[in-house]
Curated annotation (Swiss-Prot):
Gene3D superfamilies: Zinc/RING finger domain, C3HC4 (zinc finger)
Coiled-coil stretches: 361-422
Record organism: Dictyostelium discoideum
Positions annotated as zinc finger (RING-type): 35-81
Biased composition (Low complexity): 253-267, 391-415, 485-502
Keyword Metal-binding attributed: yes
Region annotation (Disordered) ranges: 242-267, 391-432, 483-530
GO cellular component: cytoplasm
ZnF locations on chain (TRAF-type): 134-188, 189-246
Protein name per the record: TNF receptor-associated factor family protein DDB_G0272829
Biased composition (Polar residues): 509-530
GO molecular function, one term: zinc ion binding
Keywords for the protein's UniProt record, in alphabetical order: Coiled coil, Cytoplasm, Metal-binding, Repeat, Zinc, Zinc-finger
Length: 530
C-alpha cells in the first residue's frame, strides 16, 4: 500500500493525455531533466532521502533507481566506464534538483486514493515539488491512521476521521441493557450470548425473563415444563424380615396404582417408584390423586430409617462398652507401672541416702585426722623451740660472764642485767604458750568423754552417729539436708568456748585411740620447767 509521497512521481505530473501510465514518452519536459537510461524524470521519488539526481565524477547523471540497478550488475559508470565502488562515491546534482522542483508542476500526493486506483475524493491542488512540505501539513485529504485504538489498522483521510470514529469496530460503547463497556464489533455477540440483563422469551410458557433469571425460572417455576414426580427417587422393597434391598426394576408398575393398608401385612410387597411425568401446574393434582400410594412409600422409608437408626445405636453402645473396657485396662496398667516406678525410686533413694551417710562420715573422719595432725605438728614445733631457747640462754650467759670479768665491773653488771631481762621475757612467752596448750588439751579430753557417752547412747538406740551428735529420723530420710547442716559452721556451747588456741576457731575433734599418743599429752616436755 503506497500513500502520499510513496506514489511514483510520474503519476503526479500534469499532462494533457491522461494515458500517461501506458506511454511515459508523452510526458513533455526538458531533456536536461530526463534520465538517459529510463527516459524518465531524474527525480524518481518524492521521499526526502530518495529525491536525488546522482552523477559520477565525470558528470554523467542518472536517476536513483537506474543507478541502483546498474551497480548491482557492474561497478562502473555506463557512459565513461569509471569504477564506482558504492553509492556513497556518487554526488548529488543540486542544480538539477532545484530546477526540477521549481519548474515541474504536479498534483498533490493525496490526489489519488490509497490504492492508486482513482482520484475519488482526492485533493485537487496543483503545486510544484518544492511546495509539497507546506501543502501536505495543511491538506485536508492527507492519510492518517485511526487514533481510537491501537488495534485498529485502518487508514483514513483526515477529513473523514469523524465519520470513522463513530463507526470504528474498536470503539468502546456501553451495553444498553447492562451498562457494561464492550467494543463495537463485539456488541452483537454480547447481546445474543453474554448479557445477563437482556430479556429472553421462555420457550415453554412464552414469558420474558432476563438471562440471569431464566434458568431459575425453567428449573423451579415454569408451569408448562414437564417434571418428574418427587417420589421417583424412592426405590424400596419392604418385607416382614426387615431386609433392606434395592429395587432395580423401577419401571415394573405404573405410579397410579394405590396400595391399601391391608397389603402391607403381606409377606413381600414390591413398591415401584412413581414414574409419572406431568406439568408443574398439574403437580398438586397428581399429589391429591396418588396421596395414599405416596404415604405408603413414605411410611416404608421411615420404618427403614428407624431400623437403621436402631442398628447404629446398638453399634454405638457396643463401641462405648468396648471403649470403657479398654480405658479400664489402660488405667490398671498405668497404676501397675506407676507403683513399680515408685518402688524402684524408693530403693534408689534409700541407696542414695546410705551412700550420703557413708560419705559424710568419711569426710568428717578425714577432717578430724587432718586437724589432729596439724595440732601435733604445732606442739612438736613449740616443744623443740622451747628446748632450744633454754640451752642457748645458759651457754650465752656463761660466755658473757667470762668476757665481762676481763672488762670493767660496771659494764659487766649492766650487760648481765639486760640479758637477764631478755631471758625472763622469753621464758614468760614460752610459759604462756604452754598454758594455752594445756587448756586446749583439757577441752579436747572433756569433749572426748562427751563423745564416748554419745556413742554409747547411739548404740543403744541403734541410730547413726557422728561427732556432732546422733542423727534424727528426718535427717536420715533427707541426706541432702543432713549434708547441708554438717557443712555449715556449728555454734559451739559455752562449755567449749575455751577451745580456741593459736590456730583460730576450730570444731571439736576426737583423738584416734589407735594412734600411739602418750597418756599425758605434756610428757614430751619432761625435763623442762613449765
Amino acid at each position: 500500500m503506497k500513500l502520499g509521497r510513496d506514489i511514483p512521481i510520474y503519476k503526479l505530473i500534469i499532462i494533457k493525455n491522461e494515458s500517461i501510465e501506458n506511454n511515459l514518452k508523452e510526458i513533455s519536459f526538458s531533456d536536461n531533466f530526463k534520465c538517459q537510461i529510463c527516459e524518465g524524470l531524474l527525480i524518481s521519488s518524492l521521499i526526502p532521502n530518495r529525491m536525488k539526481a546522482l552523477q559520477c565524477i565525470n558528470g554523467h547523471c542518472f536517476c536513483l533507481t537506474c543507478w541502483e540497478s546498474i551497480l548491482e550488475i557492474k561497478s562502473e559508470c555506463p557512459t565513461c566506464r569509471i569504477q564506482i565502488q558504492s553509492m556513497n562515491t556518487l554526488s548529488n546534482n543540486l542544480f538539477i534538483i532545484k530546477s526540477i522542483s521549481e519548474s515541474i508542476k504536479i498534483h498533490c500526493p493525496n490526489y489519488l486514493n490509497f490504492d492508486n486506483s482513482n482520484n475519488f475524493n482526492g485533493c485537487k491542488e496543483i503545486i510544484t515539488i518544492d511546495e509539497i512540505d507546506r501543502h501536505e501539513s495543511k491538506c485536508e485529504f492527507r492519510f492518517i491512521k485511526c487514533s481510537i485504538n491501537n488495534q485498529c489498522n485502518e487508514i483514513i483521510r483526515f477529513n473523514e476521521r469523524d465519520k470513522h470514529e463513530s463507526q470504528c469496530d474498536f470503539i468502546i460503547q456501553k451495553c444498553t441493557h447492562c451498562d457494561e463497556s464492550v467494543q463495537m464489533k463485539q456488541m452483537q455477540g454480547h447481546i445474543l450470548f453474554e448479557c445477563l440483563k437482556v430479556l429472553i422469551t421462555c420457550q415453554h410458557c412464552s414469558l420474558q425473563f432476563t438471562r440471569l433469571k431464566l434458568q431459575n425460572h425453567i428449573e423451579n417455576h415454569c408451569k408448562e415444563i414437564k417434571i418428574e414426580c418427587p417420589f421417583k427417587s424412592l426405590k424400596i422393597i419392604y418385607n416382614n424380615n426387615n431386609n433392606d434391598n434395592d429395587n432395580n426394576d423401577s419401571d415394573e408398575n405404573n405410579s397410579n396404582q394405590s396400595l391399601s393398608s391391608s397389603s402391607l401385612s403381606s409377606s413381600i410387597i414390591p413398591l415401584s417408584p412413581c414414574n409419572e411425568l406431568m406439568k408443574r401446574s398439574e403437580l398438586s393434582k397428581h399429589f391429591i390423586r396418588n396421596h395414599q400410594y405416596h404415604n405408603e412409600l413414605v411410611s416404608i422409608v421411615l420404618k427403614k430409617q428407624e431400623n437403621k437408626i436402631k442398628k447404629l445405636e446398638t453399634i454405638i453402645q457396643q463401641n462405648n462398652v468396648n471403649q470403657n473396657f479398654e480405658i479400664s485396662i489402660i488405667k490398671h496398667s498405668n497404676s501397675l507401672t506407676r507403683d513399680s516406678f515408685y518402688k524402684e525410686n524408693k530403693k534408689k533413694d534409700k541407696l542414695i541416702q546410705d551412700l550420703m551417710k557413708r560419705v559424710l562420715i568419711l569426710e568428717h573422719q578425714q577432717q578430724q585426722n587432718q586437724i589432729q595432725n596439724q595440732i601435733q605438728n604445732q606442739i612438736q614445733k613449740l616443744s623443740n623451740k622451747s628446748i632450744f631457747t633454754t640451752t642457748t640462754t645458759t651457754t650465752s650467759t656463761s660466755d658473757k660472764n667470762n668476757n665481762n670479768n676481763n672488762n670493767n665491773n660496771n659494764n659487766n653488771n649492766n650487760n648481765n642485767e639486760d640479758e637477764e631481762d631478755d631471758d625472763n621475757i622469753k621464758n614468760n612467752d614460752n610459759q604462756g604458750n604452754l598454758k594455752s596448750l594445756r587448756e586446749m588439751f583439757n577441752t579436747i579430753s572433756n569433749f572426748k568423754d562427751d563423745e564416748n557417752e554419745q556413742q554409747q547412747i547411739q548404740q543403744q538406740q541403734q541410730l547413726p552417729f557422728t561427732s556432732f551428735g546422733p542423727l534424727s529420723v528426718q535427717q536420715q530420710n533427707n541426706p541432702t539436708k543432713q549434708f547441708n547442716q554438717l557443712s555449715q559452721p556449728q555454734t559451739q556451747p559455752q562449755s567449749q568456748s575455751q577451745s580456741q588456741s593459736l590456730f583460730g576457731e576450730w570444731s571439736p575433734i576426737t583423738i584416734n585411740q589407735n594412734q600411739n599418743t602418750p597418756s599425758n599429752p605434756f610428757s614430751i616436755f619432761s625435763g623442762t620447767s613449765l
